[in-house]
């Protein structure tokens, strides 16, 4: 009698049944969720990761940790995909998804060992998830009414920043709020996160970080002119030089007059071009490639500032910031193609010369956060915190509702779902109860990473909630229950709801797998996927 392995090519692997497939998959997801779980919360531990390119990452950002780990186990990969989906949709809450999915599956493993069938567990999880979606709206503790209110927005951002940069949350929240409000369109729902740029400059401390209304490029201007005010700006994507023919040409020169005339023709051509550009009122020229010395000489003579930006991505962003049209042909631009900037100057930040395009009008197209820090790892980590903060702001533009943070929402959800389990007949009540208990992992982890007794902390929060203080979460400083509205620990409603749905669906998908069939991989290592050409995209 033929077995499955006889039908497949040599080297194929096959796992089936509860022990070999389901529990093995659950174990793989547990291993991955254990890695990120200890990074949860303000006192989350950092991970030191060296990726396939030998680049070092020291971070507690789950999205970065998961992206840089080269996970190959199929079940763990599903968890990675869920985290990536959360990152793409919400920009925050990746660790929440991974930790919660891992805990759901841990609880499911307990039920499987008790003898429950996977389909009964899945039914219970689906019922619990549906019930939670019904009751979650009654658990909203704060609603942001005015997105332009700096004080209120800063309060809502603090929680997201504290989980990445604890101690700097007040300062960074204000910085992010200022940057976001500078580029906020009249219709807040159209807010674009790409309009808030980050420029990292080593040196100084985190508190030296500042916001500039406009665009900052860490490079010096060409030539001697380093500052222009109320400037019309022409942007050329190519170099400023005479065009060269594709064919090689030979010139026969018989006397010295012909030699003088030959070079004079080149000079006249460049002078005419620069004169034509200067006559349009242009004060700043931006070039996308090299600039000849002769062209630079005439540009200086007309007192025009010259900036050379070789990255096409940076060039595109500058055009957006100043409202210019990038030109592909060297010549005098028409007024509609010119950009405008209130101030273009070269400033030394630390020891780095930066070209700043500053706009003084009320609404700017782009605002830039200039991040300072002692090491590149700190700069990268602050950039990730800012990225999360900007994404939370974008979420607030669409939905200003907030749930209690600090584990308060999870404990209240657990209480209500356990009451629902008691009222549910049949075997699914066991899986509903385990689903409810899984939420305790969040306050438990917050207590553990803060150095408090997790069991005591959870029982104290339960006691506070039983007395009717449903907004009480864990105060990580004292380890005692405290109102989240006093601590300003708020979690975005949309992000948390999406994360819970994603975690429930991922856990159910893993539980539905009863066989794993893997063909023999092709020889040789697979090349890593190409990322974006521009590191900032």
Swiss-Prot record:
A GO CC term attached to the entry: chaperonin-containing T-complex
Query: Which protein is depicted?
Result: T-complex protein 1 subunit theta
Compartments where found? Cytoplasm
State the family named in the UniProt similarity comment for this chain: Belongs to the TCP-1 chaperonin family.
Give the species: Dictyostelium discoideum
Subunit note: Heterooligomeric complex.
Record GO terms (molecular function): ATP binding; ATP hydrolysis activity; ATP-dependent protein folding chaperone; unfolded protein binding
Keyword tags: ATP-binding, Chaperone, Cytoplasm, Nucleotide-binding
Classification from the root reads:
Eukaryota, Amoebozoa, Evosea, Eumycetozoa, Dictyostelia
InterPro entries per the UniProt record, alphabetical: Chap_CCT_theta, Chaperone_TCP-1, Chaperonin_TCP-1_CS, Cpn60/GroEL/TCP-1, GroEL-like_apical_dom_sf, GROEL-like_equatorial_sf, TCP-1-like_intermed_sf
Chief subcellular location equals cytoplasm
Q: Which gene encodes it?
A: cct8
């Amino acid at each position: 009698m033929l077995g499955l392995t006889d039908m497949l090519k040599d080297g194929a692997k096959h796992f089936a049944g509860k022990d070999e497939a389901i529990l093995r998959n659950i174990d793989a997801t547990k291993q991955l969720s254990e890695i990120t779980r200890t990074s949860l919360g303000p006192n989350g531990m950092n991970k030191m990761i060296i990726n396939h390119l030998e680049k070092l990452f020291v971070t507690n950002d789950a999205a970065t940790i998961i992206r840089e780990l080269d996970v190959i186990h199929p079940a763990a990969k599903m968890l990675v995909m869920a985290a990536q989906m959360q990152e793409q949709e919400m920009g925050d809450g990746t660790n929440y998804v991974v930790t919660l999915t891992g805990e759901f599956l841990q609880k499911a493993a307990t039920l499987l060992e008790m003898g429950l069938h996977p389909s009964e567990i899945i039914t219970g999880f689906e019922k619990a998830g549906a019930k939670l979606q019904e009751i979650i709206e009654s658990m909203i503790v704060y609603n942001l009414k005015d997105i332009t209110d700096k004080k209120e927005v800063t309060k809502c951002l603090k929680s997201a920043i504290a989980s990445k940069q604890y101690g700097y949350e007040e300062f960074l929240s204000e910085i992010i709020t200022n940057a976001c409000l500078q580029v906020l369109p009249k219709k807040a729902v159209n807010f674009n996160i790409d309009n808030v740029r980050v420029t990292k400059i080593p040196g100084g401390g985190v508190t030296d970080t500042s916001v500039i209304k406009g665009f900052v490029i860490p490079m010096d201007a060409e030539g001697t002119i380093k500052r222009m005010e109320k400037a019309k700006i022409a942007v050329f994507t190519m170099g400023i030089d005479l065009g060269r023919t594709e064919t090689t040409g030979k010139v026969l020169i018989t006397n010295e007059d012909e030699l003088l005339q030959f070079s004079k023709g080149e000079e006249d051509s460049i002078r005419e071009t620069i004169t034509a550009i200067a006559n349009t009122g242009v004060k700043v020229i931006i070039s996308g490639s090299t600039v000849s010395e002769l062209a630079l000489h005439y540009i200086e003579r007309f007192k025009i500032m010259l900036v050379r930006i070789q990255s096409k991505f940076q060039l595109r962003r500058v055009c957006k910031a100043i409202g210019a049209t990038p030109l592909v042909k060297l010549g005098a631009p028409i007024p509609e193609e010119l950009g405008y900037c209130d101030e273009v100057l070269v400033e030394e930040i630390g020891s780095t010369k930066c070209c700043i395009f500053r706009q003084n009008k009320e609404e700017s197209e782009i605002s830039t956060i200039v991040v300072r820090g002692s090491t590149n790892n700190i700069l990268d980590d602050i950039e990730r915190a800012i990225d999360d903060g900007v994404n939370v702001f974008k979420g607030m533009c669409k939905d200003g509702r907030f749930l209690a943070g600090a584990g308060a929402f999870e404990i209240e959800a657990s209480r209500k779902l356990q009451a629902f389990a008691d009222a549910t007949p049949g075997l699914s009540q066991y899986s509903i109860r385990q689903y409810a208990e899984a939420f305790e992992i969040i306050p438990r982890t917050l207590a553990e990473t803060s150095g408090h007794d997790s069991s005591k902390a959870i029982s104290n929060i339960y006691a506070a909630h039983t007395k009717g203080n449903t907004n009480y979460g864990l105060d990580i400083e004292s380890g005692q229950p405290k109102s989240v509205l006093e601590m300003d620990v708020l979690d975005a409603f949309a992000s948390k709801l999406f994360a819970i749905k994603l975690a429930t669906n991922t856990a159910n998908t893993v539980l539905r797998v009863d066989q794993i069939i893997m063909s023999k991989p092709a020889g040789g290592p697979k090349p890593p996927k190409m990322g974006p050409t521009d590191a900032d995209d």
